[in-house]
Design a protein with these regions (language model features):
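Non-catalytic, conformational "gating/processing" segments within enzyme and secreted inhibitor domains
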Residues: 1-22, 26-159
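Acidic/polar loop patches that form or flank catalytic/metal-binding clefts of enzymes
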Residues: 84, 102-103, 177-179, 192-193
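Short, mixed-charge aromatic SLiMs
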Residues: 29-33, 169-178
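Flexible, low-complexity segments enriched for small/polar residues
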Residues: 142, 146-173, 181-241
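Generic structural signal for individual residues within well-ordered alpha-helical segments
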Residues: 41, 89, 164, 178-181
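Alpha-helix capping and helix-coil boundary motifs
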Residues: 36, 126-127, 175-176, 189, ...
C-alpha cells in the first residue's frame, strides 16, 4: 500500500532538495497507508516534499501557484471534471502560506496566507484543512479513489455497480482505507481465475519477490534491478506517478 500511495500522491527527488525530505514523506505514507484518506491528504498537503515538488513552497495568497491545487483535484482526489478553473484558483489561494526553511522544516506564514475565505466547490474555505475537507466531502472523491485502488489491486477498473458499492463502503467508514481494501480483496471476484491473472506485477514487486525466493538481501542490487526495469523508487517520471 505504501507503494501505491507513493505512485498516487507523487513527489520525486529530481525536484525535492534532499533524500531526507523524501524519506520523511515515505514514513508519512507508511503511517497513513491503511488509515484515513482525509488525514493522509491533509498531512501530504503540508509535507516538505510535496511543498517543494508541486511549488506550494513558492505560493502566496497574493500570487498563488496553482500547480498543487490542480493536481490535488485532478490526480489525487476527484479526477477530471468536478471542478473549474475558479476552483483551482480558490484552492491555490487558500493553500498559500506554507514554506520549507533551510533546515527542511515546514512552517506557516500567516502574512502570506489568504486574508479571508474563498469559494471552493461551493464551500467557503480559507485554510489548507478547509480545502481538504471540501475536496474529501465532494461526491466525486470516494468513487475516484475506489477506482484507482481497485485498479492497483486487481489490474482492472470496477464496473459501475461495483464501484458505487465500494464507494459507499469507503464513504460510510469516513474514508478509512483499510475497510475499502478488505472489501476489494474479500470479494469472490478477487481470486477468480480471469481476475487474479489480469494483474501484472510492477517491477518493484517483481524484484522484491525474486530476491525473496532466492534469499538475496542486497539493497544495492535491488535498486539496480528496479532501475534497469524503469521503476526507480522516489524518482517517478512525472506527477502522474
Amino acid at each position: 500500500m505504501v507503494w501505491f500511495w507513493h505512485g498516487h500522491l507523487t513527489s520525486s527527488h529530481d525536484k525535492v532538495d534532499t533524500w531526507d525530505i523524501m524519506w520523511r514523506q515515505h514514513l508519512l505514507l507508511r503511517e497513513h497507508a491503511l488509515g484515513n484518506f482525509r488525514a493522509m491528504l491533509q498531512a501530504v498537503t503540508v509535507d516538505a516534499a510535496m511543498l517543494q515538488y508541486l511549488d506550494g513552497a513558492d505560493s502566496t495568497a497574493a500570487q498563488p501557484n496553482e500547480n498543487y491545487a490542480r493536481e490535488l483535484m485532478e490526480l489525487f482526489s476527484l479526477g477530471r471534471g468536478p471542478y473549474t478553473q475558479a476552483d483551482v484558483r480558490a484552492a491555490a489561494t487558500a493553500l498559500a502560506g506554507w514554506y520549507v526553511d533551510d533546515d527542511s522544516a515546514v512552517y506557516f506564514d500567516p502574512e502570506a496566507a489568504a486574508p479571508g475565505p474563498v469559494t471552493l466547490l461551493g464551500r467557503r474555505v480559507r485554510s489548507a484543512a478547509d480545502v481538504i475537507d471540501a475536496i474529501c466531502d465532494h461526491p466525486a472523491c470516494a468513487p475516484f479513489i475506489v477506482t484507482k485502488l481497485h485498479r492497483f489491486l486487481t489490474g482492472a477498473d470496477p464496473d459501475r455497480a461495483r464501484r458505487d458499492g465500494l464507494a459507499a463502503v469507503f464513504a460510510r467508514s469516513g474514508l478509512q482505507i483499510r475497510p475499502l481494501v478488505e472489501a476489494i480483496v474479500r470479494d469472490p471476484s478477487f481470486t477468480s481465475a480471469p481476475q487474479s491473472q489480469s494483474r501484472a506485477r510492477y517491477p518493484v514487486e517483481w524484484v522484491v519477490a525474486a530476491l525473496g525466493v532466492f534469499g538475496v538481501d542486497d539493497a544495492g542490487r535491488a535498486l539496480d534491478a528496479v532501475t534497469a526495469l524503469g521503476q526507480t523508487p522516489f524518482l517517478p517520471p512525472n506527477v502522474a506517478g
